[in-house]
Amino acid sequence: MSEEQFGGDGAAAAATAAVGGSAGEQEGAMVAAAAQGPAAAAGSGSGGGGSAAGGTEGGSAEAEGAKIDASKNEEDEGHSNSSPRHTEAAAAQREEWKMFIGGLSWDTTKKDLKDYFSKFGEVVDCTLKLDPITGRSRGFGFVLFKESESVDKVMDQKEHKLNGKVIDPKRAKAMKTKEPVKKIFVGGLSPDTPEEKIREYFGGFGEVESIELPMDNKTNKRRGFCFITFKEEEPVKKIMEKKYHNVGLSKCEIKVAMSKEQYQQQQQWGSRGGFAGRARGRGGGPSQNWNQGYSNYWNQGYGNYGYNSQGYGGYGGYDYTGYNNYYGYGDYSNQQSGYGKVSRRGGHQNSYKPY
């Protein structure tokens, strides 16, 4: 059973990193605008199978709620070749026509979904999200109406039932854009490594904007790590293709560095692919409290070189906690079924992919 999805979904997002996804790449993801209603609890028992492992999961999770193809509407409105400003306005308008539908039965088909919601207005398109491993429904999908008034009609109805299940329709809106990641953390660096040597090595990947060499407050000596900021995001992507880099005489571990705001945003939307996959927690390495006294960066696990399971600002552990709750829509994808629950497993994610 292959996943039913829209023809234009693939153009909705570009490949990049999870947590460090660039602004344009993250505009496609959607979050629920309304709080969970009673129907969510009622529908939670009907959901779909578990998520995919490794890179497959990263791509699927990252694209959940991606922009539904509304090319027909764009052509009708004359937006197909419009300016970027008009394109953004059209995209914002289309958000008013979309709905997230949770609590679906595993037996619900795309036709069932379209037939049910067509009584509220013309349905331009709809999709069901399927588990890429089992091919079974994950218990949620998306509906795109031709007019926003249809969404209002759906929301005005107190309860919705489809295939014997109480379902949970919600308005959907675009996720907030994310800042591009231009800064990296370099761990395991010898305090004796000259700044010129650091700049020379990392300058080979792209133009370095600044290098931060934190000092130990007690000894007034350099500590065993640094932060490097680049002019662009591309050098960070290149560097993150390898976990370890030899800088001078040191074998250094590289991780994406996030500000407190970026970290909180990443936690809000859940761990995702790209950079995250390359910083998976594991054992080993000397124990150094690197992050102590360096409060400009949220506690991302830099201080624990023992690689705890939740270290590195949500990069470790690989449990997809943000994805389990599906951006606030409720847990429709990780539910027990007659087939049993498909366990979530860690894995290497190489890029951000559309579903």
Curated annotation (Swiss-Prot):
Record PTM N6-methyllysine, positions in chain = 119
**GO cellular component terms listed in the entry, alphabetical order:** cytosol; glutamatergic synapse; mCRD-mediated mRNA stability complex; nucleoplasm; postsynaptic density; ribonucleoprotein complex; synapse
Spell out the Pfam families in the cross-references.
CBFNT, RRM_1
Bias (Basic and acidic residues)? 64-73
Q: Which SMART domains match?
A: RRM
Q: Which residues, renumbered to this chain, carry the PTM Dimethylated arginine?
A: 345
Q: Which residues carry this modification: Phosphothreonine?
A: 127, 193
Residue numbers bearing the N-acetylserine modification: 2
Biological process (GO), any one:
response to electrical stimulus
Task: Give cross-link positions for Glycyl lysine isopeptide (Lys-Gly) (interchain with G-Cter in SUMO2).
Answer: 72, 129, 197
Question: What interactions and quaternary structure are annotated?
Answer: Identified in a IGF2BP1-dependent mRNP granule complex containing untranslated mRNAs. Part of a complex associated with the FOS mCRD domain and consisting of PABPC1, PAIP1, CSDE1/UNR and SYNCRIP. Interacts with IGF2BP2. Interacts with GTPBP1. Interacts with EIF4G1; the interaction requires RNA. Interacts with EIF3B and RPS3.
In UniProt terms, what function does this protein have? Answer: Binds with high affinity to RNA molecules that contain AU-rich elements (AREs) found within the 3'-UTR of many proto-oncogenes and cytokine mRNAs. Also binds to double- and single-stranded DNA sequences in a specific manner and functions a transcription factor. Each of the RNA-binding domains specifically can bind solely to a single-stranded non-monotonous 5'-UUAG-3' sequence and also weaker to the single-stranded 5'-TTAGGG-3' telomeric DNA repeat. Binds RNA oligonucleotides with 5'-UUAGGG-3' repeats more tightly than the telomeric single-stranded DNA 5'-TTAGGG-3' repeats.
Supply the name of the protein: Heterogeneous nuclear ribonucleoprotein D0
Q: Which organism is it from?
A: Mus musculus
